[in-house]
A protein has these predicted regions:
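A composition-driven surface/loop motif
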Residues: 1-177
Length: 177
């Protein structure tokens, strides 16, 4: 099957799951505007996780092109990162990721067909891994190893990773004055 989803904003990611997400067959395009973007934890086919380096507006086209495929998606909401996978992707092959430009065909729920893409900006030409290939800054939350960004919580005075260090009592962040 085909799944195309864009987050609705407010910091939410397009994908959200409890402990694991196995990707096995089908087409997936999941675009996230916030910093909660998650990747498939166990892809059984090549998958791409890309950060655009900026927030793309709704209506922007995103293209994934290789020798054996040409997928174009139209964002239905803002996005700063996206996850893409399809059975046509192969480890070791090159995928060119572009955004912007125009598309001459139809767009049904974000998936474009029956036309051609032109005039976009090339974001990257990536050699695909057999599992997940990541590119760019994607703004993920820390903690879960399957989330984009893979940041860690800072260690604070209490040492539990949840309490930041520093004095916040003078009207700065969380000061309340």
């Amino acid at each position: 099957g085909t799944v195309v989803v864009c987050s609705t904003g407010g910091g939410d990611g397009a994908l959200d799951y409890e402990s694991s997400f196995t990707l096995d067959g089908g087409i997936l395009f999941a675009a996230s505007a916030g910093n909660m973007a998650a990747n498939p934890s166990s892809p059984n086919q090549p998958a791409l996780s890309v950060g655009f380096g900026q927030t793309l507006e709704a209506g922007t086209y995103v293209q994934f092109k290789g020798d054996a495929y040409d997928f174009v998606f139209r964002l239905t909401g803002q996005a700063s990162s996206a996850v893409f996978s399809a059975p046509e992707l192969e480890g070791g092959a090159v995928c060119t990721v572009s955004y912007g430009g125009t598309y001459s065909g139809e767009s049904a729920r974000g998936l474009c067909s029956g036309g051609s893409y032109s005039g976009g900006t090339v974001l990257a030409e990536l050699t695909l891994e057999t599992g997940l290939t990541s590119y760019g800054q994607t703004g993920g939350m820390g903690g879960r190893g399957d989330m984009i960004g893979r940041g860690d919580r800072p260690e604070g005075p209490s040492g539990n990773g949840m309490t930041p260090g520093g004095d916040f009592s003078t009207g700065g962040a969380g000061g309340g004055e």
